[in-house]
Amino acid sequence: MELQLAIDLLNKEDAAELANKVKDYVDIVEIGTPIIYNEGLPAVKHMADNISNVKVLADMKIMDAADYEVSQAIKFGADVITILGVAEDASIKTAIEEAHKNNKQLLVDMIAVQDLEKRAKELDEMGADYIAVHTGYDLQAEGQSPLESLRTVKSVIKNSKVAVAGGIKPDTIKEIVAESPDLVIVGGGIANADDPVEAAKQCRAAIEGK
């Protein structure tokens, strides 16, 4: 089981600084969509240039022109790139192809997918590296959790890894870990903690069953 830190609300310098503080406890560091909107792909490059032994994910949430956008993210140092599960099949297939051609990985974000079971099966067959169930900020505010979605997707896929994101914190991560996802994505639960290193350490301990 892997742990990913999602960083959404910092500039690229502060993001790299935070990532380096917790890198002993995480496997993947994400440059979140808001940072990419604010600072562009150079934010991904800054992270890639300033951290080692950790994969860098660019949360592009690609919807179209997928092979080009994947190739650009890779050019700027991304190891993992995200595309939306609601994108056209053709877009997802070319994104997977482009990522794999460069020995990189593609994560498909299931945010706003209505028929999770059907889409997860399709994406699994297409060769997605990760399929991520994701309760976005706006639904978290309504009290929703990704737990049920995680169970649904995990029950139907054969090859892809299952990732889970959405409001996960050190004090709630154990119920997520109990469902055995392959990748747990924690954002504010680490980034906004009073002590991010301690929060990351607690999350790592939870996924290692300690």
Curated annotation (Swiss-Prot):
Its EC number is 4.1.2.43. Pfam families: OMPdecase. Pathway: One-carbon metabolism; formaldehyde assimilation via RuMP pathway; D-fructose 6-phosphate from D-ribulose 5-phosphate and formaldehyde: step 1/2. It catalyses: D-ribulose 5-phosphate + formaldehyde = D-arabino-hex-3-ulose 6-phosphate. It is an enzyme of class 4 (lyase). InterPro entries: 3-hexulose-6-phosphate_synth (IPR017553), Aldolase_TIM (IPR013785), HPS/KGPDC (IPR041710), OMPdeCOase_dom (IPR001754), RibuloseP-bd_barrel (IPR011060). One of its GO terms (biological process) is formaldehyde assimilation via ribulose monophosphate cycle. GO terms for molecular function: 3-dehydro-L-gulonate-6-phosphate decarboxylase activity; hexulose-6-phosphate synthase activity; orotidine-5'-phosphate decarboxylase activity. The keyword Membrane does not apply. Keywords: Carbohydrate metabolism, Lyase, One-carbon metabolism. Belongs to the HPS/KGPDC family. HPS subfamily. Catalyzes the condensation of ribulose 5-phosphate with formaldehyde to form 3-hexulose 6-phosphate. This is 3-hexulose-6-phosphate synthase. It comes from Staphylococcus aureus (strain bovine RF122 / ET3-1). The lineage of its organism: Bacteria, Bacillati, Bacillota, Bacilli, Bacillales.
